From Swiss-Prot:
UniProt domain Carrier: residue ranges: 5-78, 1057-1135
Pathway(s) per entry: Siderophore biosynthesis; mycobactin biosynthesis
Enzyme superclass (EC): ligase
Record's protein name: Phenyloxazoline synthase MbtB
Gene induction: The first gene in the probable mtbB-mtbC-mtbD-mtbE-mtbF-mtbG-mtbH operon. Induced by iron starvation conditions and during infection of human THP-1 macrophages. Transcriptionally repressed by IdeR and iron. Induced 27-fold by iron starvation (0.02 ug Fe/ml versus 8 ug Fe/ml). Probably transcriptionally activated by HupB; deletion of hupB decreases induction 10-fold.
SMART domains (alphabetical): PKS_PP
Signal peptide (from-to): none
Region described as Adenylation: spans on this chain: 579-975
GO cellular component: a single term: peptidoglycan-based cell wall
Free-text function comment from the UniProt entry: Involved in the initial steps of the mycobactin biosynthetic pathway. Putatively couples activated salicylic acid with serine or threonine and cyclizes this precursor to the hydroxyphenyloxazoline ring system present in this class of siderophores. Essential for growth in macrophages.
EC number: 6.3.2.-
Species assigned in the record: Mycobacterium tuberculosis (strain ATCC 25618 / H37Rv)
Assigned protein family: Belongs to the ATP-dependent AMP-binding enzyme family. MbtB subfamily.
Tagged with keyword Nucleotide-binding: no
Length: 1414
């Protein structure tokens, strides 16, 4: 154990070195944070001490940041032995020029740059422009050349298998630098050319190179140096080193020589990681306990459409001058907060304000170089790791509280950083069953020195343009020391985010930093609103719109119209039409009867029964008598109706239609009796607009219905706005579809009658029949509709030219799809169309948006917006914190003003919860999720109670539905979670394009939403079911989807067995790498849902490339395919010969299931002790001990292994089989080629004691048929019986010489092989494969070119010629010529196929040959 005093001096020296101060300036008891030590440098100390074997952790150091406390910790922790690290030269490490593994962050960037990756298709990239004077191109080129020799990573190559290779230096070759001379070009042209260069370079993916320099010579002896770096090769710290070294070399100064390389560093790290890692293991366990509770990344507002380039980054920056920086950091340190965490907290605050939650994952890159060699700090390469912060700002209302929260999150995570953030992300992905990204990044380079050292700016000029980007990164907030201050900048994929969002966010962060630097009070005061002043002004203007109220009750307008136009039609109904006078008389009769029954002003009257025209008179009479109406429809279950009667404090009941079955505990009147009685005189008294008008019961989240109390004046605001907006009057006729229980009926009745129009009543028998609605519209020339979206959808389906009279159509109460407006315009060209937002608690509607050009609505709209508040109403969109959400940020919609309800009848607690006070006024919390557009338009994005958890993510079903409805050909959609307690997401979709399939929908949806939001099950329906009130019937949708999934046997992605050999092989590879049993991996299971990640995907791809001979497979393919079935389809689609992969897969499976002894025996079966009579290159496949065998002769260039499958088929038919190996290939590669066909046949004949296996049946393909013929001649001369020769796709011996010489040049040989079709052209592009193949083919071609045979040479054995009917090289006539070479029997057979027909007909050919053997 090290003594504490000595330890204290060592620690003081190390800390002083990090801070750049003298050791004696640091008091042992002083808070080191206050002295300038930040979190990043503290973490570097932890890493340094751990490598020395000192057991300390970041959290403990951060809790007591003094030299005194650390001395005690370090002296107590020195008993741990340091971990041994393998030296670079240890055995097993790759040598220079050989591939070596990517570092974890390099691998993440390599995977993420592929197009198929979520947020991929982008390289890690840093581009800088330096504006200076007189940079000399030749000096720059010479300096860059020496720089590339000094830093091998500038020559690195990233290989397709996920490794990297540094090729040897190219000797004296100059580093390429492009020079553009614009010195004599007009200024406007100069600007144009510079802009073009910037546009091209700032977002390019460097092809092959990782470092690019370009120089532009400008007028006035000015220059612009363009520096472009692929950050997969070098991290941000390495960038500083590169530029500093380049500046020194340019100035003629040689940096100190390097005795160590990045490759050696990575090999040492890899070796270290093979040793026991107890700290890493403990940290992994710590993270594993927290994985289930980790939050999502910040859900920032994104752009719905794809019209902007989502890959290009833009930059926002602000420079904190030295005075501001010093003031900010001093105030932070005084509170025990490091500068880096102060800046991080300001960023986190912005993320919380502009995202859906105040708790989120934040990604922090760390720059960590292990001191394995004195030169490590001078190397160029990737030394980064990452840290995931679980940031929770819930309840942190002040800047100080937020900074403390972020700092605590850092301490907690950094204390367990031995298990890096990338590994945590992969574990989180496995836990959730989908790829999880951390695309919002905070990068702190504080403590690393100035971004550009003075030497760089002196040599090359001022950095005038900087931009960086990274794969799978949306927003990278960076802080770095620059020009004596701090540069705060964001590199952001602008096209991903909603317009104006990034500007507002960045401005808010800068404002906060300046506020905190300006004074201490700002740290502890409640934070100002995130709502920018301009946005606040827009909303205030819309919320401030007013219209003078009429001060009348709902029914007053009707009675005035009855006096002014008594004979005008008021109601058209199946029960009889009524004029205004007749309707007034009926209403008066109802009022008189109610009064006679004891009704007092303010009493509540229940209206029960089916929908009829008489109900209009009923509600008018109740209101005229001073009562409040409470409707209960016939669809209500008896128990619920009775609960409503009890909860509703009903005083009287009025039954429309026949007596109801509901037990009514109050005096009851039958409407039919009231209207049949003698007319009663009744004069309405003065009305009170503040009195209650009606109580409507709606569904409650607890299952208990809640009664909404609405006053006359609140409803009148909606009625008056409606009439005013659509300019409704006496000529209008309204289709009254809504039942009295539905708040839409308020407008149907009172807006129509107040404006002097007429109501066309849809009665109970018609209200579920859209064709009846269309007939009524056509018959009565209806002009106005007040509909739910579902009703309009059904009406438009059956309209059939009957809707042309419509001129005002208002739709609300649920998602209003844009296609409704488009379809309506076709059938009712004169109709105005508006979408409305609101609830029963907002007196039907509270907002309105009129569609001006239905045919040209933006294609990315998922719904018609809610619009703007009615006059006298106001709206807010409120975050969970209670703050106003900025534009594009979703929050709960609150409504205030004249048009809101009074509360819930008999539910004071619920009323207090939903009707809240803020800024001196009452607001109704709708439960709707909405967001503001930049112009103050409100957009409905879903319901708070439709949020669900999928794979650990909080998901809004409305967002999924919106994305589905943006897809081409999708007419309507509803998403749900399947019942039964699962988190299986499913969707019902209606399409208007027969080409749209469930799978195509899922594939297209992947471009719009992350993987966890793609429904696992998509079912195509003819129509989305709606409730009677016109809303999506989500219960019915869920039941339909569950039934469909149950019917298809696909409840929750169950196991699906492989159906092909290739699928079995792929399953074996995937299962082995995932560490799962074979039967735990189905062919439709998502690889990433099974726990796969980018690292494991790379291993799978490497395995497939190696074991299944599929060199074209890339990691991006794995991310695109995701399932074994899709991967098999992809691989097969790339094959010229689809059966080849099946054959290769069968070999792999056979080997994978063998023991080591089995493998050795299979690789060389003839070397078994029981078979001493044959050369080892004669491959035997034992099928039987019976006499007789088949001997197979390959084609030119062919190896014995190519006929393994024919041999297996013959063995399956109980036939002993041998396949001979020619020289110059496989295990005979070193054997000299035969000079002639005869010599080759003799060598093969002498390779075994063929008497032991006689009689022989010979099978030769192409050239092999000629070799077999000469073998047969030798056998017959030597007394070895030959039963038959099967000549497959080969010329007859007597015709070979006339064919002329075969090609001998490599290129011609390869072309001939492609023409024959037996070799995959992809393989012929592989240099190593060609090197192995061509010598064998050329040797065979030479032998065959010198062969000749007279036509009268015969063998006694039968000859059976076989070929393909589409073989363009060997015709039927050529095969027939074989008949002249036998004195025995001759047959000719053809199969469908080309020259290598055999691959498609192995079993059939084997059966024919086998039959001949016996």
């Amino acid at each position: 154990m090290v003594h504490a005093t000595a330890c204290s001096e060592i620690i003081r020296a190390e800390v002083a070195e990090l801070l750049g101060v003298r050791a004696d300036a640091l008091h042992p008891g002083a808070n080191l944070v206050g002295q300038g030590l930040d979190s990043i440098r503290m973490m570097s100390l932890v890493g340094r001490w751990r490598r020395k074997g000192i057991a300390v952790d970041f959290a403990t150091l951060a809790a007591t940041p003094t030299i005194e406390a650390w001395s005690q910790l370090v002296s107590a922790g020195t008993g741990v032995a340091p971990t041994a690290v393998a030296a670079p030269g240890d055995a097993g490490l790759s040598q220079e020029g050989e591939p070596f593994p990517l570092a974890p962050m390099q691998h993440a960037m390599w995977v993420g740059r592929h197009d198929h990756q979520q947020l991929g298709g982008v390289a890690g990239h840093l581009y800088v422009e330096f504006d200076g004077a007189r940079v000399d191109p030749d000096r720059l080129r010479a300096a860059a050349t020496r720089l590339a020799l000094r830093h091998p990573m500038l020559r690195v190559q990233f290989l397709p298998d996920g490794t990297q290779r540094i090729p040897p230096a190219a000797g004296s070759r100059d580093f390429p630098i492009s020079v553009a001379d614009l010195r004599h070009v007009a200024p406007d042209v100069v600007d144009q050319r510079l802009a073009g260069i910037r546009d091209a370079k700032s977002h390019q993916q460097l092809d092959g190179a990782v470092f690019e320099l370009a120089l532009t010579l400008l007028p006035g002896e000015r220059t612009r140096l363009h520096v472009d770096l692929d950050m997969q090769a070098a991290d941000a710290m390495s960038y500083r080193i590169l530029l500093a070294d380049l500046a020194a070399l340019y100035d003629g100064r040689e940096p100190p020589a390097l005795g160590y390389t990045y490759r050696e560093y990575r090999q040492a790290i890899e070796a270290e990681e093979t040793l026991p890692q107890p700290v890493r293991d403990a940290d992994r366990d710590w993270w594993a306990q927290r994985i289930p509770q980790l939050p999502d990344p910040p859900a920032l507002p994104t752009r719905a459409g794809g019209e902007r380039d989502r890959r290009r980054s833009t930059r926002r920056w602000h420079w904190l001058d030295p005075q501001t920086r010093d003031a900010l950091f001093a105030r932070a340190r005084a509170r025990g907060i490091t500068p880096a965490m102060t800046l991080a907290a300001a960023f986190a605050n912005v993320l919380a304000r502009w995202s859906a939650s105040s708790r989120f994952l934040l990604n922090l890159p760390l720059f960590s170089r292990q001191a394995l060699h004195p030169d490590v700090d001078l190397l160029v390469g990737d030394f980064t790791s990452s840290l995931l912060l679980d940031v929770d700002l819930t309840g942190a209302r002040t800047a100080a509280a937020r900074a403390q929260a972020v700092q605590e999150a850092l301490r907690s995570a950094a204390g367990h950083s031995a298990y890096p953030g990338l590994s945590v992300l992969r574990d989180l992905s496995r836990h959730r069953g989908t790829q999880v990204l951390a695309p919002v990044v905070f990068t702190s380079a504080l403590g690393l020195g100035d971004l550009f050292c003075p030497d760089v700016t002196e040599q090359f000029g001022t950095p005038g343009w900087i931009i960086s980007q990274g794969p799978q990164v949306l927003l990278d907030a960076q802080v770095t020391e620059f020009d004596g201050g701090v540069l705060v900048n964001w590199d952001v994929r602008e096209g991903v985010f909603a317009p104006g969002v990034i500007d507002a966010m960045f401005t808010h962060q800068v404002d906060e930093l300046l506020r905190l630097a300006a004074g201490d009070d700002a740290w502890d005061a409640p934070s100002p609103s995130a709502l920018p002043a301009a946005q606040r002004a827009v909303r205030a203007a819309l919320n401030g719109r007013t219209a003078a109220p009429s001060t009348e009750a709902l029914h007053d307008g009707f009675f005035r119209q009855a006096q002014q136009q008594p004979d005008a039609p008021a109601v058209f109904a199946s029960s009889g039409d009524l004029s205004y006078a007749q309707l007034r008389d009926q209403a008066s009769a109802v009022a008189a009867a109610l009064r006679a029954a004891g009704l007092r002003v303010g009493d509540t009257v229940a209206v029960l029964g089916p929908k009829t025209g008489e109900q209009v008179a009923a509600v008018l009479g109740i209101l005229a008598a001073g009562g409040v109406y409470l409707p209960i429809g016939v669809d209500q279950p008896r128990d619920r109706a009775e609960r409503i009667l009890a909860t509703g404090s009903v005083n009287l009941a009025l039954v429309c239609g026949p007596p109801c079955q509901v037990r009514v505990p109050v005096p009851t009147l039958l409407l039919a009796d009231v209207l049949a009685a003698a007319p009663a005189e009744f004069v309405p008294g003065p009305s009170d607009p503040t009195a209650l008008a009606y109580v409507l019961f709606t569904s409650g989240s607890t299952g208990e219905p809640k009664g909404v109390e609405v006053a006359h004046d609140a409803a009148m605001n909606t009625v008056e706005t409606f009439i005013r907006h659509f300019e409704l009057g006496a000529a209008d006729r309204w289709l009254a579809l809504a039942t009295l229980e539905c708040d839409m009926s308020v407008l149907d009745i009172f807006a129509a009658l107040r404006s002097g129009g007429a109501i066309v009543v849809v009665d109970e028998a018609q209200r579920r029949d859209p064709d009846a609605w269309a007939r009524l519209i056509d018959t009565y020339e209806v002009t106005a509709l007040n509909f739910m979206p579902g009703w309009l959808d059904m009406l438009l389906e059956v309209g059939g030219g009957r809707l042309s009279s419509l001129r005002a159509v208002a739709v609300g109460g649920d998602w209003v799809r844009p296609d409704l407006a488009r379809r309506l315009q076709v059938q009712a060209p004169s109709a105005r169309f508006a979408g409305l937002g609101g609830a029963t608690e907002t007196a039907v509607h509270a907002t309105i948006f009129e569609v001006q050009d239905a045919a040209n609505l933006p294609p990315d709209w998922a719904s018609v917006p809610y619009g703007v508040p009615f006059p006298n109403n106001a709206c807010r969109v409120v975050a969970d914190s209670g703050d106003d959400c900025p534009d594009w940020v979703a929050g709960e919609l609150w409504v205030s003003g004249r048009g809101i309800a009074r509360g819930y009848r008999g539910r004071p607690e619920l009323t207090a919860e939903r009707f809240v006070e803020h800024d001196g006024r009452t607001w109704y919390r709708t439960g709707d999720l909405a967001r503001y557009w930049h112009d103050g338009t409100l957009e409905f994005v879903g319901r708070a109670d439709h949020r669900v958890k999928i794979s650990g993510y909080r998901v809004e079903l409305g967002e999924i539905e919106a994305a589905l409805q943006r897809l081409p050909g999708v007419h309507a959609a509803a998403a749900t979670v399947l019942p039964g307690g699962s988190d299986v997401l499913a969707a019902a979709v209606c399409v208007d394009d027969a080409g749209v399939t469930a799978e195509s929908i899922r594939q297209q949806l992947a471009d719009l939403v992350p993987a966890h939001m793609i429904p696992r099950h998509v079912t195509l329906l003819d129509r989305i079911p709606f409730t009677d009130s016109g809303k999506i019937d989500r219960a019915e949708v869920g039941a339909l989807l569950a039934a469909e999934v149950e019917r298809s046997g696909d409840r929750s992605a169950p196991y699906a067995a492989p159906r092909t050999v290739l699928q079995r092989a792929l399953r074996r590879i995937v299962a082995d790498i995932l560490g799962r049993a074979n039967d735990a991996v189905g062919v439709h299971d998502d690889f990433f849902a099974l726990g796969g990640d980018s690292v494991l995907a790379t291993q799978v791809v490497a395995g497939i490339r190696r074991w299944l001979d599929s060199p074209s497979l890339m990691v991006a393919d794995m991310f695109a395919a995701r399932t074994i079935a899709a991967l098999a389809q992809l691989l097969t689609g790339r094959e010229a010969n689809a059966d080849r992969l099946e054959l290769v897969a069968e070999v792999y499976l056979e080997i994978a299931n063998m023991t080591s002894a089995d493998v050795m025996a299979a690789l060389d079966p003839i070397e078994q002790p029981a078979q001493p009579a044959f050369k080892p290159w004669v491959k035997r496949f034992t099928g039987t001990d019976k006499p007789g065998a088949v001997l197979v002769f390959p084609h030119a260039g062919g190896a014995a292994a190519a006929y393994r499958w024919l041999a297996k088929s013959l063995v399956a038919n109980d036939v002993d089989t041998f396949v001979v190996q020619y020289p110059q290939r496989a295990d005979r590669r070193s054997h000299p080629a035969a000079d002639s066909i005869e010599a080759l046949a003799l060598e093969l004949f002498e390779a075994g004691d063929w008497h032991l296996t006689a009689p022989l049946t010979l099978f030769g393909h192409c050239m092999g048929a000629i070799v077999a013929f000469e073998f047969a001649r030798l056998a017959e001369r030597n007394g070895v019986p030959v039963r038959a020769l099967w000549a497959s796709s080969g010329q007859a011996p007597s015709t070979v010489a006339a064919s002329g010489p075969l090609p001998t040049a490599d290129r011609d040989v390869l072309a001939d092989m492609v023409d024959l079709g037996g070799t995959d052209p992809v393989l012929l592009e592989d240099e190593e494969f060609v090197e192995l193949l061509v010598p064998a083919v050329k040797a065979d071609y030479r032998a065959l070119s010198g062969y000749s045979c007279p036509p009268d040479v015969r063998i006694r054995a039968n000859i059976h010629a076989v070929g393909g009917n589409r073989d363009h090289r060997i015709s039927r006539e050529m095969l027939t010529s074989w008949e002249t070479h036998t004195s025995g029997r001759f047959t000719l057979s053809h199969f469908d196929g080309g020259h290598f027909y055999l691959n498609d007909h192995l079993d059939a050919v084997a059966r024919m040959v086998s039959a001949d053997v016996r």
